[in-house]
Structure formats: structure tokens, C-alpha cells
Amino acid sequence: MKQPRSTSRRAVAIGLLALAMAAQARAEDTCSALAARALPDATITVAEAIAPGQYPMPENPLTRLASFSGMNPAGRPAVGPNPAFCRVAATLRPSSDSDIKIEVWLPLNGWNGKLLGVGSFGWGGAMMYPAMLAGLEQGYATAATDTGHDSSTEEGKGGQFALGHPEKLIDYAWRADHLMTVHAKELIKAYYGKPASRAYWIGCSLGGLEGLIEARRFPDDYDGIVAGAPPNPLVKFNAAQLWPGWLLGRHRDVNMTKAKLEMVSKAALKACATPIGLKQGFIDDPQHCDFEPEQLQCKGTETADCLTAGQVELMQQLYRGPINPRTGEVIFPGVAKGNENLLGDFVDGQAFPVALDLFKYAAFQDPDWDWTTLDWDKTVNEAVSKLGPLLHVGSDLAPFFDRGAKLLLYVGWNDFHNGQELIDYYQSLLRDSGPAAQASARLFLIPGMGHCYGGAGCDTFDKLATIDNWVEHGVAPQRIVASKVEDGEVVRTRPLCAWPQVARYVGKGDVEDAGSYACVDATR
């Protein structure tokens, strides 16, 4: 007797469901078996299958930071509930003083064959879990590390972990990232039975520097690296972060106020922004801004809308950045035009905490070091001699580029970190890294974006798809569409243009739509 068609379909559906359940069970068993996996200098502490939507996102400052849309590697306003994955956590002890935590997340279903390494931020000490989840949602196996210390503890706050712990400083500088990558690749091969076909790194700020260090020290680790706002060279970058407070603190008699800095910022915006940029609140191309503080010098009595001669001189020094008094060398560029208001917190001579920690704990191993005695020749050069070999990245990345790997650099023009330094580094990179660098490195300067995210500009773009398309298909990015997200909604799109080009309105169409802009050569 012939069975009804509906019965046959039901039987097929039940059979497929049984097969799927069996496959899921095998995947979970394979995950659990990773707990017994032997890794050099490592102990696997967790190997568990996580069901869809069942992962409780840990709360730490980096978790909250990574939840901003501009920090999402896939350029999404938010990440959703987790897909099913195998969570592996391990502790690495390559030295007697090391205590590196790593996590590797392996999709139970739909792995795309690739690895995504996720960078940290500031002084590290925790993992960027939302960034890991964003990669997981795209089918990537993802990996992260706490860089070798726990920022939730008193001794792990800021740079204090480095005090008396040279091995932990090495872990922070490069060892944690490299070993995380090595072990992630081993776990991928053990779990899926084959190696990852590609490996990408995405990070900003410290995460951007971590990416550059990986490219320099371990050129085989990653096939594509997205390095946002890398503070390189780190010592000179942090010296520049101390410069405004040091300078303003020594010249309190000049009476530079937050209100005056805000006034200068508005004047620079008015002088150098395009009509659209003026309305949206940022300068498209500060590099070609010809505003000078002398234009605001008081003609007579000082008012709220002008600068005294002393204030003009201070502004000139803040723009220039710190210089070595012996050689006349600019140590690091100062504030970019239009960002003067970012200096308001330093008018009373305050130190930038992250930068202060670098000199106190990492370089000089002295918690009582008095930063106001900083010598812009001897102090900076001594710190460079101590930390440069660990944390500075030179301009020769030929071994990375010669194997076909790609590097995407970006920084926001509304960042406290002046984008001019990254332009200078990019140019030296093209000069010193051989012919392959011309086709394998790109720089994007993002108008109106703050430090890695935020600001009035469009700060959200799909970094992951961009680097993947470049590596897999050889499509070098020249124009990337970015979004401004407010309350979970896209309110504006703009093209990001590969330097030296900038986006210009074509004269017609919606000014809030990327389609109304073309990438053109920058002009003054």
C-alpha cells in the first residue's frame, strides 16, 4: 500500500532532524574532548559547548567599550544572541611569572574555515567579548587574550602590572598575542580536522599596535591585519599625551581655559570645514586646514572671543607637539586642527593617566616618578631605549607583505591621536617595505571619528568583510562605505577614501548619503 505523501515527508523530516541532532552531539563531544588536549606551556581550563543564546556576556570595561557600533569588526550596530559554539579557555605560562588567559570560540555549525584574532584596548587586562561574538556570528573561529594580566584587580589596573614584572611586560607587548594565535590554530585543527584557511587580526588603539607588532615579529601569523589608531611609536605617542598637561601646567599665568579652547576649535571648524562638514560638526581634511591661532589674537583688551599673545604662542606649541630641545626634532605631532576642545581636561596641568603609567611603571619602574620633571630629550630617549625594542614597530614589514598579507590602517581625524603621525608612518612603510607594500597596504583617515569610535563622523564600517575581500579576491579597498549609528539606527553614510584621497560632495543628491560623494585628490 502506498504511503501518503505527507507521511513520507514527515519521515524524511524526522530522519534529517535525527541526523542533525547526531551531528550536533558529535560536535559537542569533540568540543569536550579538547579539555584533554596538550598545548605547550598551557592548561585548558574550559572546553564546553554553548547552546544558541545561552552565553552570559561577561561584564568588564572592555566589554562595554566593544559594544559600541564603531568598535564592531563587522560594522554592525549591535551583536545578537550567540550562535552555538565550542568555548575553549586556557591559561598560558611561558615564563614562571606569566599568567596569560586566552579564549578560542569555535562555531559548532557553519564555520567559514577562517580565524579572527581580536585585539585589546588601553592597558588590556580583559577580553573584547562582543568583538569575538561579532566574528562568531560571521562564521569565524575567534580568539582573544587578556594580554597576561587582570585589570579588575588592584595590581592589574592600568600599567601597574608591569612594576617588577618584566616577563608580564613581555607578555603584554607581544607574547600573549602570538601564543594565543598559535594555540588557536592548533585548537582549530584539532576540532575541525583541518587548519584554518585564513587568519585575520582586527584591533584598535592597543589592538592596532598589537596588529603591527604581529606583522613585524610574526609575519606568518596573519594573512590580513586591520590596525586602527595604532599608538606607534608607543613611547613618543605617550609623551605627546603628556605634552598638553605639562605645557599648560607650566604656563598657568597665560590663563588658557576650556572656554578658550572651545572657541579656538569652533574658529578652526568655521575656517576649514566644508559647508556640509560645518553643519555636521567636523573638518573633512585637517591636514590641509590653513587656520592659524594668530587670526584670533586680540587687537586690544582680551575678550572671550580672542586670544592673548601668550595664548597664541601656547596654541602654536600645542599644534606642533613636543620637541626635543637638543635636536629640534618633533617627537610626535600635536593636536589636529579642529580638536582643540579635546585639550580642555588639561588646562590645570593634569597628566593623561594611560601615558603617565607607561613612564612610571613600564619604563622607569617607579610609582613615585614625578612627571612634571620630564626632560623632553633625556627622559623620552631613556624610555625609548627601555621599551622601544619591545613595543615600537619600524617601517620595514617586507616579510609580511612579501607573503601576500594585507594591512589596513585607519584613524579618526577627531582623535586625540593626531592622524598626521599615521600618514608619516604609512609613507615610510611604503618606502621601506619593498615593492609588495604598494599593493598590500592602505590607509584611511576618517573625518569626524574619535578614538576608534564615536564623534560626529561615520565611525561604523565592515572591517572584517573589507580585509577578507582584499585577501581572498585581491580587491584592494579604495572606497569603504561607513555609517553613523544613533540609537541603533543608521542616520548617515559617507565613503571613506584611501589616503591621499578624500570624500567630496558631488553637488547633488542627499548630503547624508554616501552615493552623493566621490573620492578625489585632496587639495588645500
Q: What is each residue range found by the language model?
A:
Residues 2-13, 229:
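Bacterial N-terminal signal peptides that target proteins for export
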Residues 13-22:
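Bacterial N-terminal signal peptides
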Residues 194-205:
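Alpha/beta-hydrolase fold nucleophile elbow
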Residues 126, 203-213:
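Glycine-rich nucleophile elbow surrounding the catalytic serine of serine-hydrolase chemistry
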Residues 408-411:
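Short beta-strand/loop motif that positions the catalytic acidic residue
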Residues 169, 213-215, 220-323, 445, ...:
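A catalytic-pocket lid/entrance helix-loop region that shapes and gates access to the active site
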Residues 74, 112, 121-193, 239-240, ...:
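Cap/lid segment of the alpha/beta-hydrolase catalytic domain
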Residues 27-113, 129-130, 279-283, 292-369, ...:
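Catalytic-loop region of hydrolases
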